[in-house]
């Protein structure tokens, strides 16, 4: 709903709950504690099959030790605020999760924790990323932008798509080589015909 469609209409199902992690982030009420910031959204998050995290368990899982839970948000570093922002998205229990370039601002350990979480995530996940390693860990289908407004769907992760492109390129080279070989095989025949025609012409003369 942040952008109006160029054409047509968007109909969202009644049970669809979006979670959107943006590059811009959000502005926190920095007077609130870390735990209050999460509990204001939800106290329990569901994941996997019949599993739940409480707000404090989710914080601990994402490397906010219990000693930090009563700490005001104003004391957090920039990286910690990005991590807390991620948790505000996850704790909203979305069944359609959108992650916009998450590897740009999150540290390696946070990304590993996020990957672990997404492995058990049962909803629809849409990731915008240039990080092929993160894509390999989290997605099983790609939308590839080919330019000129063309988008191609591919079933598989990034490495599988890369292998597909390499094999397609090899097939193209084999086809070109085969076509060149056909041309070489045809050329001597035509040349012999031309020579015979010239000899026959001389004998005729």
Annotate the PLM regions.
Residues 1-205:
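ABC ATP-binding cassette signature C-motif
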């Amino acid at each position: 709903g942040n952008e109006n469609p160029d054409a047509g209409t968007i109909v969202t199902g009644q049970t669809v709950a979006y979670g959107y992690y943006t590059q811009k982030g959000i502005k926190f009420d920095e007077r609130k504690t870390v735990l209050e910031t999460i509990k204001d959204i939800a106290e329990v998050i569901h994941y996997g099959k019949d599993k739940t995290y409480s707000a404090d368990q989710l914080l601990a899982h994402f490397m906010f030790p219990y000693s930090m839970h009563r700490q005001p948000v104003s004391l957090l570093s920039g990286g910690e605020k990005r991590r807390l922002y991620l948790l505000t998205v996850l704790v909203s229990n979305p069944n359609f999760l959108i992650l916009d370039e998450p590897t740009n601002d999150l540290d390696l350990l946070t990304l590993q924790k996020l990957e672990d979480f997404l492995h058990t995530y049962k909803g629809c996940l849409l990731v915008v990323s240039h990080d092929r390693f993160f894509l390999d860990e989290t997605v099983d289908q790609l939308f590839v932008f080919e330019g000129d407004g063309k988008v191609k769907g591919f079933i598989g992760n990034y490495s599988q798509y890369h292998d597909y492109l390499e094999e397609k390129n090899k097939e193209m080279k084999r086809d070109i080589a085969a076509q060149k070989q056909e041309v070489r095989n045809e050329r001597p025949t035509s040349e012999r015909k031309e020579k015979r025609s010239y000899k026959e012409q001389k004998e005729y003369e």
